[in-house]
Amino acid sequence: MKKNNTNNVWIGAKDLSQDPQFMETAGSEFKDSPLFELLGEEKVGENLKSNRRDFLKFLGFGLGAATIAAGCDIPVKRAIPYVIKPEEIVPGVATYYASSIVRGGDYCAALIKTREGRPIKVEGNPSSKVTNGGTTARAQAEVLNLYNTNRIKAPLRKDENSFKALSWEELDIVVKEKLNTGKAIRIVAGTNMSTTSKKLLDEFVVTYPNAKVVKYDPISSAALLAANEMNFGLKAIPDYRFDLADVIVSFNADFLGSWISPIEYSGKYASKRTINKIEGATMSRHIQVESHMSLTGSNADNRIMVKPSEQGAAIVKLYNEVAKLTGATTIKNMPINDKANNALKLIAKELMASKGKSLVICGNNTVEEQVIINKINDLLGNINNTIDFTHSINSRQGDERGMALLTKEMNQGSVDTVLFLDVNPLYDYVDAAGFITGLEKVPVRISTAYTLDETAAACDFIAPNHHMMESWGDVNPKRGHYSLIQPTIHPLFNTRQAETSLMYWMNKGAEDKETVYFEYLKLNWQNSMFKGALIGEAWEKQWDLILKEGVYEETVSPVSVGFNGDLTAAVNNMVNSKNTDLEISFFENVNVGNGQYAENPWLQEMPNPIDRTVWGNHLTIPISFDGDRRYESFKDLKDGDLVDLEVNGQRMEVPVVRVFGQMQGTLGLALGYGRMQAGKVGTGIGVNANVLLSQNNGLTQYFAEGISVSDKKGVDKDFACVQYHHTIGVTAVDPETNEKFNADERELVDDFWKNVTTGFQGALTERSIIYQTNLKDLPEKAAWLKDKRHHAQELNERQIYNGYDELYEMGHHWGMHIDLNACTG
C-alpha cells in the first residue's frame, strides 16, 4: 500500500491514506448528487425538489395538529412561566416554562421555549444544581416527539388483529372490571424518579392487593446497585464527583455519552479540564479502559485496550497493584494482555498519588467486578469524598432479575393482568422471546404507550399517555434535589396522563380529568415535602415560586458509609475469558438509547460522534497499522460493506464501519435499532442487537465471545456517513513527486510535508486552526503562540475586499472559540 499522510491529525481514513478520489474532491464543499440518486432505484423525476420540512412531513411530523389543538392560548391555566407570567400570548414573543425532560432514565431540568402556545425549543434550566443548564440531543429532540402524528390519538381496544377506538369512559369500565376480577396483577415499569407517582403506585397496590410492581431499565445498572447494597448497605448509585477528582479511571463507563447521568457528569468533568492560567496550570487525568471507542474514550488522556472478556481481569490487576502499595491483601490475578498489564501498574501509582482525590468507576453489569471497584475506591480513600452517598442518584432503579421471575410466572399461567407503564420489554428486554411466549398466556394486557411500540401492539387495551410536555409531574433525580414537570401545550390528541388513568381505575377520579393528578401532585408536595407547614395563601405563593423556578432543594442529612465485602468470593465467582479470537461489545450510543428515541428523525439523522454514521447501527471494525502509517481494516472491509454476524447461534446481516481506536480482535455494535414497531421513522432501521445479548446470574451482559463474521457479502446501498469537512483549499502538490496531498495544518506535519505550494488554507498564512501541547510545555508553547500572533498581525489588517475601509477599521469580532479540553462531544 502507498505511503500515507504522516500528519498527526487527520479527518478520516481517506485523508490518512491520501485516497485519490478524496484528494480530487477535497476542494469541493458539496458533492454533486442528484436527489433521485440518493433515493435509490425508485422512479422519481430529476427535477424533484424537497426540503427538510417536507422530509419531516413525509415521516409523519408536523405542526398541523398543534395548530388546530393549541390555538393561540396560554398552554394551561395553572402553568407558571419561568420569568414573568403574561396576561396574554403576544404573537412572535417567546415564553419560557420551567419543566423537566424524563425518558428511560434520562433526566434534564429544562426551560421549554414556546411561541403562540406551542413548544418550539428545549433549553437547560440554569437554576438546577444537577444539570446546571445543560441539555442533551435527546432532550432537545423531545419537541419533535411531541408533534409526532404517529402518536396514538385515542384509547384503543384490540378486535382480533386490529385496534379500534373507544371512549375513555368505555375503557375505564372494562379495565376496572378486569382489575377487580384478576387474581394476579403485574405492573411493569421502568425507573420512576417521581415521588408522587411512586406514592400513587403504592396506593394502587393497596387498592389491588394482588398487584406487584416490576422495575427494569432498557440499559441495566442492576449489578452496580446490588454491589453497593452488599458493600455499603445502600441499594443506590452514589454521586460521582468528577469535579473533585484529579485522576479518573473508567472501566467501560461512557459517562460523557450515556452512562447514568451524562449531562451532570459532562459539566463536572469539564470543570476539571479547563485551564484558567498558564503558569502552574493543572487539569484532571483521565484513563479509559475499553475495547471500542466511546465518546468518553475519545476524550481520555490515555486509553488502555482490553477485550470485553478481560474487563474483570483488568479490574483485579488494578486492585492488586493498589493493594500492594497500601499493604492490603491481594487476590488471585486473572490472565490479561501484556500492554494492559504494564499500563495498569503505572495507573495504580498515579491513583496512589491522588488518594482521596481520585475516582474509579465501572460500567459493566457484573456484581463481582463492581465489588472489586468499590474496594479499590475504599483503599484509595475515595468513599465519602469523590464517591458521595449523601446525594445519591435515582436515575437507575431497575433489576432485570425481577423480569425473569415475571416471565416464569406468565409462562406458568399464574398472571391474569399485566399493565405496562411506558416500557417496551418485547423489544429491549434481554429475554424478549421468553417474555413474548409468557405474555401470550396472560388474559388481560394493558399498555399506556404514547406510540404503538412492539409491546403496545401485543396488548388488548391501550390507554395512551400524554407527552411529557402535556403533563404534570415531579422528579427526584438525586437525594435532596427535585424538579417539576408542567404542561406547555394543551393535549394535541385524545390522550390521558398515565397517572390519571391509574387514579380513575382506583376510583379516585374527579369530574375534571385534566386536573385530578395536578391536584394530587400539589397536595402531595404540601403534605410530604413541606409537612403541611404552609397553608392557604402562603402555600400558594410557595408553590408558584417552585413552579416558576422549576427546581427545589431540601437539606438532607449527610450519609457516611464504610466498605464491607468478601473479595475472595468475588474473584472466585468471576468468569475467565475463553480466549477466543473475536469478541463483540454492545453499547448504547448518544442517539437513540436502547430504542426509546428510534422514532425521532432528528436523532436518527444526527451523526454518531465517533463513526459519523446516521440512520442505523453499524458493526464497528478495527484498523491495524504496519508502523509506517499504512493501515488495513478487519478482513479488508470498507465502510458500508455487508457481512453476516453470528453471535450465540443468532445470525444477522449488518453493514460495517471502520473505527480508529477499536481494539484488534474485537468488534462493536450499538443497541437501540432494528425496531419492528416504530412508525415510519424507526421501523426496520438497523439491526436489533438486543437479541444477541446474554445473561450471567440473571444480569444482562453487554458482550459476547466466540463470534464469527463472514467475508464481504455485498454493499449496503443505504449506508449514510457524514462527508469529510475542513477540506476546502487544502490540496497541495509535492514538488518532488508531483503527488497531491493535504497541505493544511502544516504546523503539525513532519518535515517531509512542509515543502508545500502556497495558496492553500494552511500554507497561505503558515497558521493552523489546531494547536496542541501538554501541561509541561504549556508556558513555552503559549509564549510561542503569542509571538506568532504578533508576527501575523499584518494579516488581520489586510483587506480582502477593497472599498470597505470603515468596516475593516472596526477590527475582527471572533464569534467562536472551542476549548477542546472542556468540549466533550
Predicted regions and their residues:
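Active-site phosphate/pyrophosphate-binding segments
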Residues: 302-411, 528-535, 539, 543
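Long, low-complexity segments enriched in small/aliphatic residues
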Residues: 527-612, 763-764
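Phosphate/diphosphate-binding loops
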Residues: 424, 434-435, 440-453, 490-499, ...
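N-terminal export/assembly segments and adjacent metallocofactor-ligating motifs
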Residues: 2-338, 343-345, 462, 511, ...
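Short, polar loop motifs at secondary-structure junctions
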Residues: 289-294, 448-454
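N-terminal leader/propeptide and maturation segments of large enzyme subunits in energy/redox metabolism
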Residues: 328, 491-560, 641, 725, ...
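A short, gly/pro- and small-residue-rich
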Residues: 258-280, 430-446, 481-484
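Flexible glycine/proline-rich, aromatic-decorated loop/lid segments
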Residues: 451-485
